[in-house]
Amino acid sequence: MSSLRRRVLLLALLVPGILPAQKAPSKPQKAAAAAIGLSTAGLAGQMVTVLPLTMVVSDPRVPGTAGPKARAGILRWADSLFNDALLERAPEVDWVFPPALRRATTRSGGLLPSPDRMGQSVMRSSNLKETPDPLRGYVRQLVALAGGARFALIPAAMWITPTQSDTLVVELSAVLTDARTGRVMWRTLAAGKGETMADAYHAALATILAADGTPPAP
């Protein structure tokens, strides 16, 4: 290498801005989805199956949420509040909740897995326009055993994250599917913020049953 080229290279290394800066690889982020409320006017008088929540992801900085036992407790708690919110804010819909679904699968004599083990957390992906197999088949058989509902409401996944202002953000991915065809009729990523996990979750649920929600397509 010539003396001139060595001097140019040395200058480039010492003086900022001569060589292009190397960007650090960005961290993978959860796909964003719009928080769209579900209008229940089009569901009035109809039976809608509600599957249980099976996935919760909590930041390790949130106390009391780590480990299988804590996650199981959060799932039961979140399901209970979700079901209560549906009954309180949309009593015009004939909701079929997870306890009834569990009894139905028990009566099936092993033909269907428990509704807690059907793999419905896959529906958290915002790219899915249809329910994939084998979940599609499970849901179709499940609603047939539990009364023949046309739609299935699936709370797919829940995320709990702390903020820098000592509050918590709870996000809930939920979809409404046509139980017969598997088509996704409605999807939301409901988000709420609060001083406690309960406050944040209640705020998230309030966005799901908004008065100006979008009715499912026929």
Q: At which residue positions do the language-model features occur?
A:
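Bacterial N-terminal signal peptides that target proteins for export
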Residues: 1-9
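Alpha-helix initiation/capping motif
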Residues: 5, 97, 195-199
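Histidine- and/or cysteine-centered catalytic micro-motif in compact active-site loops
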Residues: 8, 101, 158
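N-terminal hydrophobic alpha-helix used for membrane targeting or insertion
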Residues: 11-12, 167
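Hydrophobic h-region of N-terminal signal peptides that target proteins for export
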Residues: 12-21
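C-terminal/domain-edge helix-coil "capping" segments
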Residues: 22-60, 78, 118-119, 129-151, ...
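N-terminal segment of the mature soluble domain
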Residues: 63-149
